[in-house]
Amino acid sequence: MCIRDRYKQDYESIEFSDFFAFVQASSFEPLYLAVTFIFSQVVSFQTFLFLVSVFNGFILYRFCRFFGAGFSGVGAVCFCWTYLATNMATIRFSLSISLVLLAVLCWLEKDKFKSIFYTCLSVGFHSFSLAFMPLLLLSRVELKASMVFLILSGGVVFGLSFSYLLDSGLFSYIPFSEKLLFYSEKSARSGISIGSLFYVALNGFFMICLFRDRFESVLLNLARWSTLILLALQVGMWFLPVFWNRYQVLTVLIQAVYISFNFVRRGFMLETLVLMLISLLVLAKFLLDPAFVSYVPYQNVISEVLGTDRGDGERRFYEALDAHIDRNVK
């Protein structure tokens, strides 16, 4: 929510400055700045959020329909795992993810020109979209089980090399090198959490299930590649969780589409129930743990429902934000 609050401040400040002054004062990507400037002239920030949600929802619906998956099931999984933390917190990243989904669809349809076009648009909203290029290029290459260990080993080698180059200062010429160093030092102080280890184990188990599936399809191959790349990042880039946390947003979408299509269509009721319980536990952790600042407004609602005094919600949000910052500094 601290990022979202910054979005709101930038959005509302445009009316007091021209476009070029706004661009110079902001560090966001150019295409997002252009879209923000255009919409700020005609609609309020809340309306802009609504339009972003409608656009993202429509693209997700189209992605589900392409593979014949149920939209409601996919939406439920994404809501528990990623929606509140991306669409409601990092607006430009959510738009970027939607454009990456369009790029993947066009690539699978062998329309390379449109795929490259949507990829360029996604980078214009968030530069991290470049990290999804390997998945895009490999999505039509059949993934064999014999390649898994090799790719995971490559992830470890890449992670160790990246860590060495980062610590040695060889990445200092990169514009966001300070941010990379900040996130890696922050992770080193906090260590690896039990939740992160559980998530790695869960993805490993899901990877095994994907290779046990004998009904080969484009969706299955895409789910295998996205899960494997996420695992390689989790194992190799453990010191930079912000990297694989962003990557998992797309992976969760693809996994949700696969699960919605296969678990429900094939009648895997027990597996579906287990997934539902795990997803609800993940959502409960986000809603109840004060460390997740982006969920403070929803935590306020829960407090009110439980009968406590609602008080000043905005004041409580900034108190939670200050506590979160102090916790990271320590």
Spans of features found by a protein language model:
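Loop-to-helix entry region of an early transmembrane alpha helix in multi-pass inner-membrane enzymes
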Residues: 30, 41-58
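Transmembrane-helix signature of polytopic, membrane-embedded enzymes
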Residues: 61-81
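Short, small-residue-biased leader/transition segments that mark boundaries at the very start
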Residues: 1-3
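Alpha-helical transmembrane segments and terminal signal-anchor/GPI-anchor hydrophobic tails
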Residues: 7-20, 136-252, 290-310
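Short acidic/glycine- and proline-prone juxtamembrane loop motifs at membrane-interface regions
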Residues: 88-94
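Short hydrophobic/aromatic helix or loop-helix immediately within or flanking a transmembrane segment
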Residues: 7-43
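Transmembrane helical bundles and short interhelical boundary loops of multi-pass, membrane-embedded
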Residues: 226, 254, 274-330
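Membrane-interface transmembrane helices that cradle and orient dolichyl/undecaprenyl
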Residues: 100-114
